[in-house]
Amino acid sequence: MTDARPRICILGGGFGGLYTALRLGQLSWEGHTPPEIVLVDQRDRFLFAPFLYELVTEEMQTWEIAPPFVELLAESGVIFRQAEVTAIDFDHQKVLLNDQDKGTESLAFDQLVIALGGQTPLPNLPGLKDYGLGFRTLEDAYKLKQKLKSLEQADAEKIRIAIVGGGYSGVELAAKLGDRLGERGRIRIIERGKEILAMSPEFNRQQAQASLSAKGIWVDTETTVTAITATDVTLQFREQEDVIPVDLVLWTVGTTVSPLIRNLALPHNDQGQLRTNAQLQVEGKTNIFALGDGAEGRDASGQLIPTTAQGAFQQTDYCAWNIWANLTGRPLLPCRYQPLGEMLALGTDGAVLSGLGIKLSGPAALLARRLVYLYRFPTWQHQLTVGLNWLTRPLGDWLKNEPS
């Protein structure tokens, strides 16, 4: 930039981007020119993704899990730009944006953070794009709620749902839908591997399997989907093929890197993720950092940092510090990742968690999960507002239902 004030440009308002921006706003720039910190995201709201399931069951409301960026950043000194990132010009250190109001423009940077996240892979499967529904964004949750409402209002005896993918998202979503639909639901998880939650601790996997069984949710392992229509899915188990009638297909199969990240003129791994060093700098670029789903991050010990919310949480402190160090002439710190365990929601009245020597399931785990995530909300103001709402909502519901 020609301006004496350096600019830090953060692309992506997910966990990695937003929390890095907030942390940068908290650091002291005494004795140095304070930078301009700009956060860019194409949506107007941050999404606390672990609670997206609670939106479907109406345990939580949109404002709780998806507060507007302008509210979260109001007292941080961080500037928010709602725009789509279309390209990055590394030679001239500019980000090209498509702004709904301003059209195409560029944004110069001195320090850059690439935290654009990932997307659900959509293979060339017959019927998937027309009849499959993803579950990653706020818009996906709204579409699912609308579809469920339509199915619930119809006079069909059963509501048949196929969930493709037996990872965290598929299992948590199945359990929540099982509780919402009750006896009327006919839910099936389709997993091509030998078991669901293949990366989970054994305790979590066993508790999840027991919960799904108790809710009457079927699990088909070593099974692939070969076609989807408006009324059925075709499944292949070894050499056998079956056609199963369905009302709704939910696609929750993994994460892939966005085409924008994949096409950047930067070092990538075989999955298209940006290669970074332990300081979270993109290889060969001292002023460009990457974290989250779009980056292959390794900590000081060489341990691969998982592309989860927990991994992003821990990366953001180091990312913010190292940008600050770049601009103030301090030494950069290598990231140190500490696995803290795993939590899964298993319906509206239970969960499971394990980590740091603790194993917990049922309502106690559900409460612990909520409190841990409440603590992880972006700002203390949002923590306070949501926490008070959780405390007072039961009283409000009771008063609403109390006979006059």
Curated annotation (Swiss-Prot):
Positions that bind NADP(+): 159-195
In Gene Ontology terms, what is one molecular function of this protein?
Answer: NAD(P)H dehydrogenase (quinone) activity
Protein's GO biological process: aerobic electron transport chain; phylloquinone biosynthetic process
Tell me what this protein is called. Answer: Demethylphylloquinone reductase NdbB
**InterPro entries, alphabetically?**
FAD/NAD-bd_sf, FAD/NAD-binding_dom, NADH-Q_oxidoreductase
As for family, the record states: Belongs to the NADH dehydrogenase family.
Segments passing through the bilayer:
none
Recorded source organism is Synechocystis sp. (strain ATCC 27184 / PCC 6803 / Kazusa)
Q: What does this protein do?
A: Bifunctional oxidoreductase probably ables to act both on prenyl naphthoquinones and on prenyl benzoquinones. Catalyzes the penultimate step in the biosynthesis of vitamin K1.
| Regulation of activity | Inhibited by dicumarol.
The main enzyme category here is oxidoreductase
Q: Which residues bind FAD?
A: 7-43
Q: What happens when the gene is disrupted?
A: Increased photosensitivity to high light.
What domain of life does the native source organism fall in? Bacteria
- E.C. designation(s): 1.6.5.12
- Which pathway does the protein contribute to? Cofactor biosynthesis; phylloquinone biosynthesis
Reaction it catalyzes: demethylphylloquinone + NADPH + H(+) = demethylphylloquinol + NADP(+)
Which cofactors are required for activity?
FAD
